[in-house]
From Swiss-Prot:
Cellular localization per UniProt: Cytoplasm
Cysteines engaged in disulfide bonds, as pairs: none
Family under the similarity heading: Belongs to the NDK family.
Catalytic residues (positions): H117
Top-level class of the enzyme under EC nomenclature: transferase
One term of GO molecular function: nucleoside diphosphate kinase activity
Protein name: Nucleoside diphosphate kinase
Function according to Swiss-Prot or TrEMBL: Major role in the synthesis of nucleoside triphosphates other than ATP. The ATP gamma phosphate is transferred to the NDP beta phosphate via a ping-pong mechanism, using a phosphorylated active-site intermediate.
The species this protein was found in: Sinorhizobium fredii (strain NBRC 101917 / NGR234)
Lineage: Bacteria, Pseudomonadati, Pseudomonadota, Alphaproteobacteria, Hyphomicrobiales
Length: 140
């Protein structure tokens, strides 16, 4: 199995409820290792840039508003098949459809306030990691 890195974010709805430790523990218990982490409060410009792929979607404005409404934890996770494992631990985007024991089933409030974000593939992971971290900030 290949060791890979992925991007993970704990969203404002979760940080406001002091769930950072609980969510990080779920990720680590699944075999993922945090190799970079920082707490940021996204500006509107940063949120627009990070979610630019959704710019033409009807929910874009609401997404930007939400993501700039409070602190987030941006982090790089490392482990065997880290991208797939992170997505499995997060659960379905809609918490109503998420498997029992996943982050979103346990902690999400709604499809919009679903507590976490994770990269969906290797290219996206590389882009999202580079958006928030310099290479020297990632310590494996």
């Amino acid at each position: 199995m290949a060791i890979e890195r992925t991007f993970s974010m704990i969203k404002p709805d979760a940080t406001k409820r002091n769930l950072t430790g609980a969510i990080t523990k779920m990720l680590e218990d699944a075999g993922l290792r945090v190799v970079a982490s920082k707490r940021v409060w996204m500006s509107r410009r940063e949120a627009e840039g990070f979610y630019a792929v959704h710019k033409e979607r009807p929910f874009f404005g609401e997404l930007v508003e939400f993501m700039s409404s409070g602190p987030t934890i941006v982090q790089v996770l490392e482990g065997e098949n880290a991208i797939a494992k992170n997505r499995e631990v997060m659960g379905a985007t809609n918490p109503a459809n998420a498997d029992e024991g996943t982050i979103r089933k346990v902690h999400a409030l709604s499809i919009g306030e679903n507590s976490v974000h994770g990269s969906d593939g290797p290219e996206t992971a590389a882009e999202e990691i580079a958006y928030w971290f310099a290479g020297t900030e990632i310590v494996g």
